[in-house]
Amino acid sequence: MLSLRTPGFQGESVQFSPLVENKIAVAAVTHYGLGGSGRLYIHDVTPKGIQVCQHYDVEDSLFGVRWSQNCENQVYACCGDGSLRLFDLTMPSKPIHKWKEHKAEIVAIDTNTVDRRIVVTGSWDGTIKLWLGNLPNSVQTLNNGSNSRILTVATHYSSPNLLGYTSSDGLCKFWDFRSSDKFMSIEIPNQITCMNWSKSNHRMVYTADNNNLVYCYDIANLKTPLSVLSGHQLAVRSIKSSNSAHDLLATASYDMTSRIFDPEQHSCIRKVDLHSEFVRDVDWSDFGDGSWIASVGWDESLYIWNAF
C-alpha cells in the first residue's frame, strides 16, 4: 500500500493515466468544495512511493479529472465556476484551454475510449455537454431540467455514442449522442447516486443508491437487476469496473470505506478502511495485472492499494 497526504486539499476525483503506467492525477478542493480554491495534482508512482510531480492551483474548486485519451501529457479538469480546463504537463504555469458554457458547477467529467476526441461534462445547471477535441465550443447539449443537478456521467467503453448519467431527480438515464434526447432510464424507489459501465461486458451497467446498495443490470432489461450487492453502511459515491475478463467492482462510500464486489458471486469480497473521512472516488490501473486501485477522500489522502 502506498499513500500521500495533500495538506489543506481534500480529494474529489482520481484517475490513473491510460497511456503512461506510473502517472496518476487527482482533483482536489479546499473547504470541502464549499468555497475557496482547487488544485490539480500530477503524481508519479514509483517503487519508493508516490511522488508529487507537479500541481496546478486554480481559483475555484476542482471536482473532476480525466486524462486525455489522445495525448499522454494532457489532463482535463472540471471546475466550480462552470469551466472545463485542459492542462498540458509540458506547460506548467496555466491551462492551455478553458471552456465556459455551463451556468453552475461542473461536478462530473468523462472521456471516451473509442472516439478519443470525446469529452463529456455534467453540471449542477442540469445540462450535459459533449465536447470534441479542442474545438472552441461544445457540439451538443442535453438539458435534463434546471431543477435536476447532474451527479455523474460515464461514457460507454465500446460505443462512441452512448452515455449514462445520474441526476438529483434520483434516476439513472441514458443518452445516445445521435439523438437529441435521453432514450431510457432506470427507476427504483431510492435515489440513484452514481453509475458506471462494465469494461468487459458491453451490456452491463452498474448503479448505486442512497440505501447503500449496488445494482447490476443488463441494459436490455433495466426493470430487474441481475444482482444486488450489499455491504456499505452509507451511500456509495463512486463505482469503477475492473479491467479483467471477470468483472470486479471497486466502490467509494460515505461510510469511509472502499470495497471490492464480485457481481457473479453476489458478494463483497474485500473491505478497505484506510480513509478517515468520506471516500470520494476510486480508480483501477490499466497496467500490470490490473489489481491496483487508487482512492481519494476528504481526509486529504491518496492511497494506492492492491484489490487482493
UniProtKB/Swiss-Prot annotation:
It is found in: Cytoplasm, Cytosol; Peroxisome matrix. WD repeats lie at residues 57-88, 101-132, 145-176, 187-218, 231-262, 274-306. Keywords: Cytoplasm, Peroxisome, Protein transport, Repeat, Transport, WD repeat. GO terms for molecular function: peroxisome matrix targeting signal-2 binding. Gene3D superfamilies: YVTN repeat-like/Quinoprotein amine dehydrogenase (2.130.10.10). SUPFAM superfamilies: WD40 repeat-like. Its main location: cytoplasm. Disulfide bonds: none annotated. It comes from the Eukaryota. Signal peptide: none annotated. PROSITE patterns: WD_REPEATS_1 (PS00678), WD_REPEATS_2 (PS50082), WD_REPEATS_REGION (PS50294). GO terms for cellular component: cytosol; nucleus; peroxisomal matrix. One of its GO terms (biological process) is protein import into peroxisome matrix. Interacts with PEX21. Belongs to the WD repeat peroxin-7 family. Receptor required for the peroxisomal import of proteins containing a C-terminal PTS2-type peroxisomal targeting signal, such as 3-oxoacyl-CoA thiolase. Specifically binds to cargo proteins containing a PTS2 peroxisomal targeting signal in the cytosol. Cargo protein-binding triggers interaction with PEX21 and formation of a ternary complex composed of PEX21 and PEX7 along with PTS2-containing cargo proteins, which is tranlocated into peroxisomes by passing through the PEX13-PEX14 docking complex. This is Peroxisomal targeting signal 2 receptor. It comes from Schizosaccharomyces pombe (strain 972 / ATCC 24843) (Fission yeast).
